[in-house]
């Protein structure tokens, strides 16, 4: 009987004029559906990793070792999750006293500054005044110090709003690093410089950089053999762990037949897992990672219903039902695909409840309210499109700030985490602190800049780009330039709100930093990597989830 109803619904859908969009199907097929690995092999790897960790811990405690370089290598190689307390203690020691006064070398001074700032320690950028000449410009002699330039370039991305010396440092280093890449392709640092110019460390996904840096580190004649072995083994072990996790999520997607039930929606389960892997990769966050991946998958379907398939009358019914969040509302929904969606959404959140302890359920309730809020925003945008209404930039942003999805993702990222997330955490989040608003605005602007060409080709609500053009009477090029300036400013506000003492524990803030990095990755290249899966995203997924590092 249900199949007859569905068939009837599908027939009526063909008659209804829908704003359909043809998204390409999943490029992965069933590649990640099954996971096979030798458990004995994993045990052997884990035992060797534990041995190497103890060796490295002794090196960290050694006072005669180059501690800055060691910390930097641990982070770049993707190993810092094993040494969080040791690194924390070392950096606090390095932040006090006269350590910075000993750094007359540009590379070391910049490294000291970057490592401390990215751990929330408020060190002054005045340390770089010593590298300026009498006229207030960076010394010309620095141009030949390539490693120093690269280190200063990376440090400059930890700047605050109005920190002019770091703005000058960024302009100075960018100019000369580009020249080095163009004119000295055989320079030993050429590859690292190109990568940094493409995406600086502050904006880079940790696991992707670890994969890249392991290959660079191995070629360094002075590399630490223990660190290199540990980095390779740890990367491959985590890859196995992530592949197993992904297979569970893909099976969940397949068993619920999402692609079949919602053929108009993007089928991007693998890409979504990769996205959330950028938020947290550590094994201890497995539960949180799986839950967040499922929620972003449901949100993607919701987005496509509102943005690419549903009629305004259908969306109005669905919006009202979602605000009530009551299975009894399902009977009032038509056509059949809305009933299916509603049932799937409510049942999925019931599944999530079962995965949580009773005392954790308040976190899911908070996240559920954010889901309701994003649905209201989706409907408001659909109403604008239906009425042909062109909002002002400010009016658009009040709605699209929510529809960006990042407030929902931040809230949901905390649901599966441990006791570090408390009622106070969610109270802090509800006040929309600067780090949250900056991250959300950044993702909104980068999404709109990256997806605008595709959206202009179909009947779609106007983005912040078009609304900015209208309100300020400027060209598209000028609007994009201005929004990119705002993106850069958002990073500075994020840096400012990351400084200790913070209102919430650092693991809470790191989720926001990492979510911001995922937005940068998905939209920076002037396109929407999620909707249109290209070579960059495909290669990145292969690097993290298919190809192990040769030992």
Swiss-Prot record:
It catalyses: (2E,6E)-farnesyl diphosphate = delta-selinene + diphosphate; (2E)-geranyl diphosphate = beta-myrcene + diphosphate; (2E)-geranyl diphosphate = (4S)-limonene + diphosphate; (2E,6E)-farnesyl diphosphate + H2O = selina-6-en-4-ol + diphosphate. Binds 3 Mg(2+) or Mn(2+) ions per subunit. Keywords: Lyase, Magnesium, Metal-binding. GO terms for molecular function: magnesium ion binding; terpene synthase activity. Its cofactor is Mg(2+); Mn(2+). SUPFAM superfamilies: Terpenoid cyclases/Protein prenyltransferases, Terpenoid synthases. Its EC number is 4.2.3.-, 4.2.3.16, 4.2.3.15. Pathway: Secondary metabolite biosynthesis; terpenoid biosynthesis. Involved in sesquiterpene olefins biosynthesis, constituants of cannabinoids and terpenoids-rich resins. Catalyzes mainly the conversion of (2E)-farnesyl diphosphate to delta-selinene, and also produces minor products such as selina-6-en-4-ol. Can also use (2E)-geranyl diphosphate as substrate with low efficiency, producing minor amounts of myrcene and limonene. The Asp-Asp-Xaa-Xaa-Asp/Glu (DDXXD/E) motif is important for the catalytic activity, presumably through binding to Mg(2+). Belongs to the terpene synthase family. Tpsb subfamily. This is Delta-selinene synthase TPS7FN. The gene is TPS7FN.
